[in-house]
Amino acid sequence: MSIFTKIKKSLKSENLVNYNKFIKNLEFDEKNSTSTHLIIKAPNIFIANFVKRKYLNKISELYEKETGIKPKIDIVTKEISHRPLTIEEIIEPTTPSVLIPEYTFESFIVGPSNQFAYTAAKSVAENPGKNYNPLFIYGGVGLGKTHLLQAIGNYLKSSLNVLYVTSEQFMNEFTENIRMKTPERFHEKYRNCDVLLIDDVQFFAGKERTQEEFFHTFNELYNQKKQICLTADRPPKKLYDLVDRLRSRFEAGLIVDIQPPELETKIEIIRKKCELNGIYLPEEIIEYIATKLDSNIREIEGMITKINAMSKILGISEITLDFAKQALKEHIKDKKEVITLEDIIKLIAKEFNIKPSEIVSKSRNKNIVAARRCAIYLAREFTKESTPIIAKYFGLRDHSAVSHAIKSFNKKLKEDSEFRIKIEELKNKIQIKKSE
Ligand SMILES: Nc1ncnc2c1ncn2[C@@H]1O[C@H](COP(=O)(O)OP(=O)(O)OP(=O)(O)O)[C@@H](O)[C@H]1O
């Protein structure tokens, strides 16, 4: 009998009223668990939350009694394996401890905000140890750093010895091996891989012994032309508590950033997540989530899961916009509507040296058309107006004309780096106005 079956049996024998409802259908994820880190699958988010609140300590205790090991336990839902569970947890930064098969290049949506990082990661995966070494990916919370790092690992794991760890795991293992007087075991593991992927290296900050060890690991692998990829929440030059020689190693490779996704990219990501998880959401709800929530994709995923789970539990077959609004009510921060369509028009008119009225006119003058497209794009990014309202305001036929204008705009953003910089500057100006 497996240990997990024994644990379930003990929970049953303790006559827990909720055994059938909450414990019976829990499954042990053998493939992804280790002896110190257990992953348990629950049928849905509510059961998972309940088990976490009520039974986690008990399960941990029973496991320790059986094995002598105090485990770390993650309870995940079957729908989205490996996801942390409560909405609060989903919003919290969390990093997995194993390679997650779903994090691939194919499931990663590319837009102007992450194009550079994606291309660099793909290139590293296709030519490990040859093009960019190390690859350093940085960016804000929940923007896809781990996903890209793991995509490299998943791409290479069948042909090479890939090692994926968080900086914390690296540190814990190092400390543990020192404590057990087995440093050679640690060296054996880390200095003999072909690809080393370390997530969240900002946590090396201030840990001098770990940094020292990592420095040697780095050199050893680098000299053997093994690929090293790192992620952090900031660029190497801002990792202040890192020893200089390590920082300069990081800086010697390719450094790429991931920016918050543009609205279109966000919408695409939501579509993809729904598709991957077999969730159907009408377009208007997808757009609602994308415009109302910030850029943290993990948070967005949490909201999709929540809407889906609530609809199932309440037996609702068709999810309406009102239902979604209700479900997300408490999670949508009450941001004041500070940027209006008029603000955008004024700003663009000034930038393009034309009159505000010309932007909303029917003129086909090249400069005015460019200004209009830009204004439409920014209106979608920064105001809370729906696509039909924006169409009406700019004198366009209907919402599909808005989508068309945004598509052409995104194409230009992708192709023309000077243009991209100009738009970034405009976005910054709007952000400044927003925070005034
Ligand atoms: N462009 C994208 N396409 C598809 N999914 C994405 C994209 N960007 C982020 N995600 C998803 O968002 C979630 C959070 O991403 P990830 O864990 O990679 O973020 P992170 O940048 O590593 O965040 P943290 O700083 O908290 O570690 C993941 O489920 C990931 O699949």
Swiss-Prot record:
Q: Which SMART domains match?
A: AAA, Bac_DnaA_C
Q: Where is region (Domain I, interacts with DnaA modulators) located?
A: 1-69
Any Gene Ontology CC annotation: cytoplasm
In Swiss-Prot or TrEMBL terms, this protein is called Chromosomal replication initiator protein DnaA
Main subcellular localisation? cytoplasm
What function does this protein fulfil? Plays an essential role in the initiation and regulation of chromosomal replication. ATP-DnaA binds to the origin of replication (oriC) to initiate formation of the DNA replication initiation complex once per cell cycle. Binds the DnaA box (a 9 base pair repeat at the origin) and separates the double-stranded (ds)DNA. Forms a right-handed helical filament on oriC DNA; dsDNA binds to the exterior of the filament while single-stranded (ss)DNA is stabiized in the filament's interior.
Q: Which family does it belong to?
A: Belongs to the DnaA family.
Q: Which organism does this sequence originate in?
A: Nautilia profundicola (strain ATCC BAA-1463 / DSM 18972 / AmH)
Keyword Protein transport on entry:
no
User: Which parts of this chain are annotated as the region Domain II?
Assistant: 69-97
Annotated stretches, region: Domain IV, binds dsDNA: 312-436
